């Protein structure tokens, strides 16, 4: 039986999602928990919708795994959460057909980037929002954001070590909202390149400070060169919010 699970995790104390020898990762903790639950000699492989870097959080990451156990859907979260550390939580579990794939069946992903605007650092937010105490021209930030919506070659907005050759992606939505003591950037796309959301966030903040004009975004897209765009915003402000599938 193939199980699809929606999980949340606090990325602060993890060395990213993917298993890495000698490091604490989300995938490693999930596979250890499943191995214990199944009383198996070997790991139960877990497939995710995609990897997240060290420090990046998830509200709605999706995983799948195959299991011979006859556990009711509603009981799976309880069974796994009892074996997982308290910075990972299984929120929902459902049985799916064998053709479902957490990564390849995904149609869209939503990320959010959190910014704290207080004058002084907040010790309770230091791992969960990027502290930006300086003034930002949000009208220009929103104007610049519109250039990024649509289908483009995002070479300028991904890390230079990105291995995939096709860097064309579609951004369906990109919007900013006031959270009271900060800002939230919400972005929905068909898929994202390595560091793409963080580079978009950092570049748009650079527009807000006046380093770039809104129209410069169009030039950056056409340049297809990472050096043309702005900074990479820190990992700790980024959240994988949800993964969207066909019903």
Curated annotation (Swiss-Prot):
Keyword tRNA processing: yes
Assigned EC number: 5.4.99.12
Keyword field contains GTP-binding: no
Pfam families: PseudoU_synth_1
Superkingdom field: Bacteria
GO molecular function annotation: RNA binding; tRNA pseudouridine(38-40) synthase activity
Main EC class the enzyme belongs to: isomerase
SUPFAM superfamilies for the chain: Pseudouridine synthase (SSF55120)
Catalytic site positions: 53 (nucleophile)
The name this protein goes by in its record: tRNA pseudouridine synthase A
Species this chain originates from: Bacillus licheniformis (strain ATCC 14580 / DSM 13 / JCM 2505 / CCUG 7422 / NBRC 12200 / NCIMB 9375 / NCTC 10341 / NRRL NRS-1264 / Gibson 46)
């Amino acid at each position: 039986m193939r199980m699809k699970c929606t999980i949340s995790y606090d990325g602060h104390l993890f060395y990213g999602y993917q298993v890495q020898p000698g490091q604490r990762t989300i995938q490693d903790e999930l596979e250890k928990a499943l191995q214990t639950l199944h009383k198996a000699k070997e790991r139960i492989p877990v497939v995710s919708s995609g990897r997240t870097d060290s420090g990046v959080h998830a509200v709605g990451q999706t995983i799948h795994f195959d299991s011979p156990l006859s556990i009711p859907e509603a009981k799976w979260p309880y069974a796994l959460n009892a074996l997982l550390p308290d910075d990972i939580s299984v929120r929902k579990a459902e049985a799916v057909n064998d053709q479902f794939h957490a990564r390849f069946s995904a149609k869209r992903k939503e990320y959010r980037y959190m910014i704290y605007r207080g004058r002084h650092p907040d010790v309770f937010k230091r791992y969960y929002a990027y502290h930006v105490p300086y003034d930002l021209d949000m009208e220009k930030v929103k104007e610049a954001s519109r250039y990024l919506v649509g289908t483009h070659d995002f070479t300028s907005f991904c890390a230079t070590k990105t291995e995939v050759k096709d860097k064309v992606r579609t951004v369906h939505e990109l919007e900013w909202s006031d959270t009271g003591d900060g800002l939230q950037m919400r972005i929905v796309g068909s898929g994202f390149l390595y560091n793409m959301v963080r580079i978009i966030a950092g570049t748009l903040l650079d527009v807000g400070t006046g380093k770039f004009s809104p129209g410069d975004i169009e030039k950056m897209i056409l340049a297809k060169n990472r050096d043309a765009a702005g900074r990479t915003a820190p990992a700790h402000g980024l959240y994988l919010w949800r993964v969207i599938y066909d019903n």
